[in-house]
Amino acid sequence: MKTLNFCLFLVIISSLTVRVFCLNDRFLTVNDNYVICLYINKSFVNCENLCKAYMNAKDGFCRQPHCFCTDVE
């Protein structure tokens, strides 16, 4: 029983820590708008400025380690 509980504990912890939206840069559609998901494996990245400067997007938000650029033209 202890082994089963330990295995269940490991599965729950791994499912919480391994959530990844995208491993590579890819386009997504959210409410009929194109959104690009950038994989940025660095801390302290300003996603809003990155999206506006390099992706010609109107806005961007961060969900580490990803930047989501919205309204990409």
Curated annotation (Swiss-Prot):
Please tell me whether the keyword Transcription is annotated for this protein. no
Which residues form each disulfide bond in the chain?
C37-C62, C47-C67, C51-C69
- What is the UniProt domain comment for this protein? Has the structural arrangement of an alpha-helix connected to antiparallel beta-sheets by disulfide bonds (CS-alpha/beta).
Its keywords, alphabetically, are: Disulfide bond, Ion channel impairing toxin, Neurotoxin, Secreted, Signal, Toxin, Voltage-gated sodium channel impairing toxin
- The residues covered by the LCN-type CS-alpha/beta domain are 24-73
For this entry, the protein name equals Putative sodium channel toxin Ts39
InterPro entries per UniProt:
LCN-type_CS_alpha_beta_dom, Scorpion_toxin-like_sf
Gene Ontology molecular function, alphabetical:
ion channel inhibitor activity; sodium channel regulator activity; toxin activity
Q: Name one GO cellular component term.
A: extracellular region
Q: What does this protein do?
A: Putative sodium channel toxin.
Q: Per the annotation, which location comes first and is thus the protein's main one?
A: secreted
What is the reported tissue distribution?
Expressed by the venom gland.
Q: Which family does it belong to?
A: Belongs to the long (3 C-C) scorpion toxin superfamily. Sodium channel inhibitor family.
Q: Which residues form the signal peptide?
A: 1-22
Q: Which organism is it from?
A: Tityus serrulatus
UniProt superkingdom: Eukaryota
Where, subcellularly, is it found?
Secreted
